[in-house]
Amino acid sequence: MTDLHRLSIRELAKGLSQAKFSSRELTEHYLKRIAKIDPQVKSYVTVTPEQALCEADAADAALKAGNATALTGIPLAHKDIFCTKGIKTTAGSKMLDNFISPYDATVVEKTKAAGLVTLGKVNMDEFAMGSTSESSYVGATSNPWALDHVPGGSSGGSAAAVAADLAPFATGTDTGGSIRQPASFCGLTGLKPTYGRVSRFGIIAYASSLDQAGPMARSAEDCAYLMNVIAGHDAKDSTSVKKEVDDYVANLNNTSVKGLRIGIPKQYFNVAGLDAEVKARVEESLKKLEEMGAKLVEIDLNMTEAYVPTYYLIAPAEASSNLSRYDGVRYGYRCENPADLMDLYKRSRSEGFGPEVQRRILIGTYALSAGYYDAYYVKAQKVRRLIQQDFLKAFENVDVIAAPAAPTTAYKIGASLDPVEMYLGDIYTIAVNLAGLPAINAPVGFDKDNLPVGLQLIGNYWSESQLLSIVHQYQQNTDWHTKRAAIAEENA
């Protein structure tokens, strides 16, 4: 079959269980597509054909023996921030260019246990710091919808791989929008779960109180299948929460859009820099939900102006602490011929980290320094609590909150925006991480240049099933999620 890449996860699972095709055939199909198409997209940093085919053969044996799970034999790609035993894990950095993890991240462990086949590792912004995937040490990834545009970040490789049909779904991480924004830029569905819903064990840390892993796929249904695998408590992650996990696939039709109260924050739709076409597409999608029976309720989120300064004190502060472990001594990049120990530290870090990572380490170190700790970091944590309370107050009157996932569509590679401009572009996504809430992006149309636009829905704690269900029903009534970039239509 030449069009296996056009099948949904449900259709792939059905085809495998009915022996219409084997996992080996499916895996070979994707490997051929990667070999032909990815040199243009540059989504993968490491492709693992031998391991993938070995896992596919094991999946076929399990399917034949009747020992298969719902997803046995289906391929996926992992963001290169998840530790993978025996496979290089770089986090997009020269610092970890030759790092091979001795263990699997819990998310990877769970996908293997479910019989999923790892195609390889996909590109990302260095240490997940960025919104374009341009800061990666191996080079920029292209947006399949326009190869001279960025796919977003930091999970840009995950988004590009799925959008180009080089993987049926992929794992991502979201510290301030890194699943939702690239999903928006590439016309995909992407879910950032509640903090603590998915294990962080084995994820190379950026900001520990903000990082969360989640699925990226074409549809809410496809995301639900992957959430069923990766969600759940993990004793190896102290921030993982002991809470019963929903059957996200079974719950896809459990939330009625009829009567659903969708909060429309006044402040969000009056942000300077919100593109008129993005605003129009988002408003059209909300009108569609209203036609389906939802009720649009105008709300206030009065802390909106505090999002960016608060996030860009807390996240860099945590990053400066987490990244202090990379000193050239135990693992990671080591400079050549250091004069002494201090020279080893200084040069290894200066040469191993890229400019954006260095910038955030400097900001974070400054915020944590003795003279400024109370004035900046402690104050930011207090404001963080106010942002959380702002959301909780809103949820007393609405079920979900709607917003754009990004103020613009994808911009051109090398546009070299001012860092502050880039930070301001995160305004719609970062508060969700500060509050620890779940949120989802759904594709809702295109701008005049045929670049995708995304709608973000923010839910209350542990409402992943509700968010997936709302988007699933929206996708039953629209076809934006089925649209494919021209490059994805190519056959290997």
From Swiss-Prot:
A cellular-component GO term for this protein: glutamyl-tRNA(Gln) amidotransferase complex
EC number: 6.3.5.7
One GO term of the biological process aspect: translation
InterPro entries assigned to the protein according to its UniProt record, in alphabetical order: Amidase, Amidase_CS, Amidase_dom, AS_sf, GatA
Ranges in coiled-coil conformation: none
Active-site annotation: K79 (charge relay system), S154 (charge relay system), S178 (acyl-ester intermediate)
Source domain of life: Bacteria
One Pfam family this sequence matches: Amidase
Record-level Gene Ontology MF annotations: ATP binding; glutaminyl-tRNA synthase (glutamine-hydrolyzing) activity
Alphabetized UniProt keyword annotations: ATP-binding, Ligase, Nucleotide-binding, Protein biosynthesis
Catalytic activity: L-glutamyl-tRNA(Gln) + L-glutamine + ATP + H2O = L-glutaminyl-tRNA(Gln) + L-glutamate + ADP + phosphate + H(+)
Subunit-level organization: Heterotrimer of A, B and C subunits.
UniProt function note: Allows the formation of correctly charged Gln-tRNA(Gln) through the transamidation of misacylated Glu-tRNA(Gln) in organisms which lack glutaminyl-tRNA synthetase. The reaction takes place in the presence of glutamine and ATP through an activated gamma-phospho-Glu-tRNA(Gln).
Stated family: Belongs to the amidase family. GatA subfamily.
Protein name (Swiss-Prot/TrEMBL): Glutamyl-tRNA(Gln) amidotransferase subunit A
Gene source species: Acinetobacter baumannii (strain SDF)
Gene name in the database record: gatA
